[in-house]
Amino acid sequence: MKKFLLIFILFILGIRCYAQEKIPDVHIITSKFDRIEIIRMNSATDLLIGLNEAVQKRNIKNAVILAGIGSVTDYHFHVVSDKNLPPAEEFPKASVPKDLISVQGYILNGRVHAHITLSDENSVIGGHLEPGTKALTFFIVTNGVLPDDLDFEYLDNYKY
């Protein structure tokens, strides 16, 4: 019984030490693209729905969203609104025409995490893409597809 208790205590201490290991402030993953995919979406297409559809159709597990252009009739995104963790968020949404001047982000284990930048003659706005951003003319998005064996689901988790 004493031996079991000693092993149990050492096990618990080991878990505590492992949990307290410092995660590096900078984490680097090296890879190459398997392929480049260019996705075109027609007028009235929802950008996030279209990206998710392309990910499913082309069986994309991991990718870098390299570029995106187009124009919108409606937009919806979210932005952080304070310095706390987890941060408070605001969800701007409007039905106005704007140019889509960039899309970038990642596909992490099949999950789209995209940010958009929009402009008109007076302002530039943007944030984390939400459903409801719809094409006026078209969207073109370029994805650099990465190997499936990369494990970086955690990259966009602030708790990591």
Where are these regions (language model features)?
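Sec-dependent N-terminal signal peptides
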Residues: 4-13
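N-terminal intrinsically disordered, cationic/polar leader segments
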Residues: 20-45, 49-56, 62-67, 73-113, ...
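Sec/Tat signal peptide C-region and signal peptidase I cleavage site
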Residues: 15-19
